Regions:
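Compact beta-sheet-dominated domain cores in extracellular/mature segments
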Residues: 1-85
Length: 85
């Protein structure tokens, strides 16, 4: 809880393109089974059927390199990962 969330430039609105090794480093922000979205938040269905939180359509992720709430070590990685703002 309190960990930084990121967006991935290679995703498309409503679609996650981060799987396998990518998802190992950038774990998706998975919604609880009974979650309901509202406002700018929505749910994106991943290939495995899991529901992932999205902001303005863009799927949200954590960065495995962040160890404490407020860490932003993933910001700018590869030029394609950005802190949710």
């Amino acid at each position: 809880e309190g960990m930084t969330l990121y967006i991935f430039d290679k995703d498309a609105p409503g679609t996650s393109n981060c799987y396998d090794g990518c998802a190992g480093s950038w774990p998706p922000f998975i919604a609880e089974t009974d979650a309901s979205a509202e406002g700018n938040f929505s749910l994106v269905t991943r290939k495995d059927g899991a529901e992932q939180w999205a902001f303005k359509g863009m799927p949200l992720y954590y960065w495995a390199g962040d160890s404490a709430p407020g860490d932003v070590n993933g910001d700018g990685v590869g030029g394609v990962w950005h802190v949710l703002k």
